[in-house]
Structure formats: structure tokens, C-alpha cells
Amino acid sequence: MVSSSEVLSLCRALLRAGRQFPDYNIREYSKRRTLDGFRMNKNLTDPSKVTEAYAEAKKQLFVAERVLKVYLAYPPKTKNIMEVKLQ
Amino acid sequence: MASKVISATIRRTLTKPHGTFSRCRYLSTAAAATEVNYEDESIMMKGVRISGRPLYLDMQATTPIDPRVFDAMNASQIHEYGNPHSRTHLYGWEAENAVENARNQVAKLIEASPKEIVFVSGATEANNMAVKGVMHFYKDTKKHVITTQTEHKCVLDSCRHLQQEGFEVTYLPVKTDGLVDLEMLREAIRPDTGLVSIMAVNNEIGVVQPMEEIGMICKEHNVPFHTDAAQAIGKIPVDVKKWNVALMSMSAHKIYGPKGVGALYVRRRPRIRLEPLMNGGGQERGLRSGTGATQQIVGFGAACELAMKEMEYDEKWIKGLQERLLNGVREKLDGVVVNGSMDSRYVGNLNLSFAYVEGESLLMGLKEVAVSSGSACTSASLEPSYVLRALGVDEDMAHTSIRFGIGRFTTKEEIDKAVELTVKQVEKLREMSPLYEMVKEGIDIKNIQWSQH
């Protein structure tokens, strides 16, 4: 059984990875998708289901960390209009 | 001693002002950064200055690649460089496995057997292959094709090509909501009809055709049914058995996959046969010769799997945004018309017409929103969209249509911004418009007899 602190730290790690994407849309999506994903599985009690969901999220974290390196290597030349106006 | 004092003063004078200077400079650059950045960020392209990357609301034209798809492609890109048709070494086997895995993923999304998937370069090729291929194969007995007036250009052009070869084509009109009249379809079918080609989701107006009913009619008359599902797969539930399609065109780049790859579903039982467009090494069951683009195909497969997993989640989100956009615009503007049926519609599409506004001026004014007036192939010309004309939309309204395409990565803030900018632009143009003034005064502009000078 995965402990709740492990789940929380995984959620935080995913959020942290998502925050670093230089692309506005992907950054916003990964934040929303991470939070919604963890919220959706908030009430899971079946240990096997919890382990499954945890493993899935872990896989997503690996993907995010891998592609993040490439995305950071090729940042967009100009910012998204949504970010420009926010400054 | 004196030297010590001097050096201390020098140090003080050097460090102190330097310290304040650097702090000042830091502040000034920080302050300037926001301004200068703003200038730097602006893009000058094709004579238009835009202050940043426009917000992307053209998801029917194409979609950005999903990072998860990108990751799957990267992994394949490095080592699986073998030719998937090489049978004599590990490199070929690995690539073949990757392609077959993708074939399974695509097949699963549309409830087909992997053996029925033929990878091609995109939906245009798939459509050409289906329309021309089937008619050419059965040319001795079948001479007639049925399609609709709102099809994608590649189907219409393939049909035109067939007409030049002596085939007959019926272009079915659509109702004002964009849906096909089933009775008309039934009447149009002849004994020598070789193919019915009707798209599942329209690329311009997002209307979802009654696929199951059309499939039933085709089955009754024993006519093969082809559908262009490039805008449908991964967005609405697709089941080739339920729809009763013989052929179905698909594309990867509409579902957050890579460009340059698509697939044609070719039913095996009852078997549908077609003449290939490409002849050569006999890859893909002899239907599409040419080395398979392994990495693109892997990306397509990954995109399909992802789309299947995320369909419900995405739809809920996109539906919310569509409502937000429509309500936002309607709240502030009158004379906004949704083109196409609102009930039978893919939620990520919103095709709006703004009355009393000139379409091109509106699009030019909306440079900070990436939208188009219709499909990418016709938006370059000043002609109004043929799809809207087929719907019976008035010339002036067809000219002012804007297609908003909402997708997985669209945010609420982007929608609010798009509403704000659209409303601002439409109001500005209406203020200048003498037509709008006349309408406000209660003159019916449709009844005006314009004199020519």
C-alpha cells in the first residue's frame, strides 16, 4: 500500500515538473491534469487500485521529466500573448 | 599608513558607488525588462506586428503535439531505425514490432482489427485512396458515387477527377443545420452506385452526421460506405462496426499526433477491395507501397491510445470552454449566429457569423487570436466558404464567419481573452459600419434596392 505522504510528494513532483515547461499551454495543462488526476482518485481505497494509480502517475512523472529537458532546450522564441499581458 | 588610508578610501569609493550603481541598474533593468521585453516579444511577420504568440484557437486545422506523444516518438527515433519491412535482421524486427504495436493502438480506438489498418501519409491520401481506389477497382459494374456538398476538398476533388474519367457523382445537398437528409440519400442510391462517401465530423462547422443511420442505409442497399473521420477519431466515440463503414480515413495531427501520418481503415469482412494509388514493394497489404514512416506511425499510435484514455476528460473540459466562449460572445454582442447544428456537433468547434461586419477586416483585427474563417485550404481566398453556402447561409453572413477550434491545451483565460478581443473588434467595426447604423434605425437592409453608379 502506498502511503498518503508518498502520493502527496508524487503530486508535488509532477506539479513541479509541469511548472517548468516553457510553453504556456503545456504548463497550464499539466497543472490542471495533475490536480484533476489526483482529485479523481482521491477516494480510492482498494490497495491494488491505489498502487495502479500511483504507478501510472509515476510513469507520467518520468515522461514529464524526460520531455522537459527537450522542451527547455528549445524554448519558444517569443512568449505567448497570455504571458506578455500578465507581466 | 597613508597608503592604507588611500587604498581604503579607494576601496570605499569603488565599492560603495558601484554597489548602489549596480543596485540601481538592476532595478532599472528589471523595470525596463518588462517594457523592453514587451517590445522584444513582439513579432513582425507579414507586415503585422503582434505583441506575442497569438492564442491558438485553430484546433480543426491542426493540433500541437502532446508531450506524451513526443516522448513515445523520441524513444523510437533513436534506436528503431530499421526498415519495418526488413525481415532478415533485428533492426527490421524491432521497427516492425513498433509499427504493429501502433497498429493495435489505432485499431483499438476505432474498434477494428489491427489487420484492417493501412498506414498512409494522412487523411488526404486516405480519402483519395478510398474514393478513387474503390471506383477504379469496381469500374466495370459501378459507375456512380454519392457524396455531400460539405465534404472536405480532397474528397470533392477526387470525385471531380472521377467525373473526368466518366464516372457520375451525386453531390447531396445538406439541410440548413448541416446534416444530410437521409431520405435524399436513400433516393440517390442507384443499382450502379459504387460508393457513398460522407464525412463523420465536418471540419468547418463541426457537425456530426448520423453515422449509424447512414451506415444502415448503405448496408440495406449493399453499397460500400466511406467516411472521412479525420476530425472524429479520438474526439467522439468511433465504432466501425456500429457505423457499418467499409472504409474510414484518419489523421494523426488532428489528435495531438505528428503531421504526415494517417491511416485508412479497410474492412475485411465483408471484404472491400480497392486499387492502390502507390505501386511498389507491396507494403501494407499491397495497398500502400513505400517504407513505413516508423516514428510517425509510433506517434500516431501513442496519440490514439492517449486520445482513448483522455476522451471523456477532454470532452468535459472542451464543452465547458465552448459554452464559455459562446455565452461570452452572446452576452455582449447581438447578431451572432452559430453555423451548423448545435445539438449534433463536436464540442471543440464553434463556427460563428457576426452580422454587419466584414469578415476579412475582423480576421485582420484579430491578429492576436489564431483563428480562421473556415478550413485552412479556403481561408486564403476571399471567397466565402462553400460549406456555409451549402448550408444556405446568406452571402454576407458566410463572409463573416470565424471558426473557433478548442482543444486539450486551451485554457479558460485564453477563451476569456478571445471573447474580449473579438467583442472589441466587432464593436469597433460595427461602429464604422453604415449598415449597422441603418439596422439600428430599423431599416431592413435585405429590402434595400442598391442603385449602381
From Swiss-Prot, chain B:
[2Fe-2S] cluster binds at C377. Residues 1-34 form a transit peptide. The keyword Transport does not apply. Transmembrane segments: none annotated. Its cofactor is pyridoxal 5'-phosphate. Pyridoxal 5'-phosphate binds at A123, T124, N203, Q231, S251, A252, H253, T291. It is an enzyme of class 2 (transferase). One of its GO terms (molecular function) is pyridoxal phosphate binding. Its EC number is 2.8.1.7. Threefold increase in the catalytic activity in the presence of FH (frataxin). 30-fold increase in the catalytic activity in the presence of SUFE1. InterPro entries: Aminotrans_V_dom (IPR000192), Cys_deSase_IscS (IPR010240), Cysteine_dSase (IPR016454), PyrdxlP-dep_Trfase (IPR015424), PyrdxlP-dep_Trfase_major (IPR015421), PyrdxlP-dep_Trfase_small (IPR015422). The keyword Transit peptide applies. Catalyzes the removal of elemental sulfur from cysteine to produce alanine. Supplies the inorganic sulfur for iron-sulfur (Fe-S) clusters. This is Cysteine desulfurase, mitochondrial. It comes from Arabidopsis thaliana (Mouse-ear cress). The gene is NIFS1.
